Amino acid sequence: MKWLFLLAALLLAGCVSAGPAGGSLDSIARDYVKLQLAIGEKEEGYIDAYYGPPKWQAEAKTAPGTPAALAQRAGVLAVRLSSLADGRLDPIERRRRDFLLAQLKAASTRLAMMQGAKLAFADEAEGLFGVRPELKPLSAYDPILARIERLVPGAGPLADRVDAFQERFTIPRERLEPVMRAAIAECRRRTAEHIALPANERFTLEFVTGKSWGGYNWYKGDANSLIQVNTDLPIRIDRAVDLGCHEGYPGHHVYNALLEQKLARARGWVEFTVYPLYSPQSFIAEGSANYGIDLAFPGDDQLAFETRTLYPLAGLPAARAPQFLALHRAMQDLAGARFTIAADYLDGRIGRARAVELTRKYQLYSAVRAEKSVAFIDQYRSYVINYGLGMDYVRAYVESFGEAPERRWAAMESLLSGPTLPSDLVVP
C-alpha cells in the first residue's frame, strides 16, 4: 500500500535528521505530548482533550512547525521508542511503549493525509485506529431489514415506517433535561456499584445545536467533563440511556477520569494528558462507551428503568415500550452497513446523494437524519468504524471473562484503566 511506503519514508527521514536517539520512556512521552499539541495546531478538532502543562500548549501555538517537519518528529520518536528493547522494560512499560508507537503511527498517518495522501477507507481506518474493518456488501444486511419489516409492518418504505413509529417516542423539548439527568444518574449509580470513581468526579450538561454528532464529551481534566447533547433533531427516549452511558458512565467520562487517575497522576505518564482524536485510543473509547450501555443495563434492565422512570418523566405512554426497544436493538445489527456506505462514498464509488439514499435504506433513517449521518462522515471519515466495530471488540473481550457481572465489570475497569490497544482485545 502506497501510504505504508510513505510512512516508511517519513521514519527514514526522521532517522537521518534525528537528534539524540533513545532516552527514557518519560522523556519520549514528554516529546510525544508536545508533538501531538503541535499537530493539533494544524487541524481543528485533532486534540480532543488536554490537561497537561499549559506551557506546552503555549509553545505549540507559538511554533507548531509544518506537517512535513512534524512527520519527521514523529519518525524520530518512533525510532527512539523502537530502540527500547523488551529486555529493558517490564510488562507494563512494554505496553506503554507499544501504546505510544501505535499513537505515533496514527499521527504519522494523519500528517500524511494533511499533506495530500489519498488513502482507501480501510487503509485510513487501519492507519488511524489500528483496526482494518471488514466491509461486507450491503446485500449482507438485507436479512436484517427483513427481520425489521416484521417488527414494523405496513405500507410504504421501511425507513418511513420505522421513523414514524420512533417519532411516537420523542421526548418533548421542555422535558428533555430532567429525562437526561435521570438517565445519567442511573448510569452513574450502576457504574459506581462496580468501579470506584474518583472522589471529585463531576460533569456539566449542556444542550447545543448545529453539530453533526448527537452527543459529545469534552474532558477538562481533574475528573471533570462537559457533556453536550445536540438537539438539532428530536431525541427519542432510548437515546437518554444511550447518551448517559456513552458520554458519561461507564463511557467517555469514566474512561478519561480513570486514565487521568491511574496513569497520568499515579504513574506520571504524561502522554495520557493529551487525547488525539484520530488514534487507536478512540477505538477503545467509542467501543467501550457503546458496550457500556449493555454492561450497565443487562437483559431487560433498560426497559424496566425506562418504563418505571423515564417514560413518566417524558410524559410518554409506555404501552409499546417493549416493541420500541426491540426495534432499537434490531437496528444495531445494521451498524456495519454504515462502514460500507462510508467506504464507497469516501473512496469515490458513489456520490453524496447515493450515500444519503443508502443510509436511509440501511440505517432506516428519515431523510433529515440520513443527511446528518453523511455530514458526520464528511467531517470524521473513517472514524465511524470505532462505534460498531469497537463495540464488537470490547464485547468479545469483556464477555470472554465469563457471565458473572463482577468479572465483566472487572475486565471493563482494567480495559479502561490501562494503555489498552485494539490488539489487546483480540480474543484467541
Question: What kind of region is each of these model predictions?
Answer:
Residues F5-G14:
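Bacterial N-terminal signal peptides
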Residues C15-P428:
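N-terminal maturation segment of proteins
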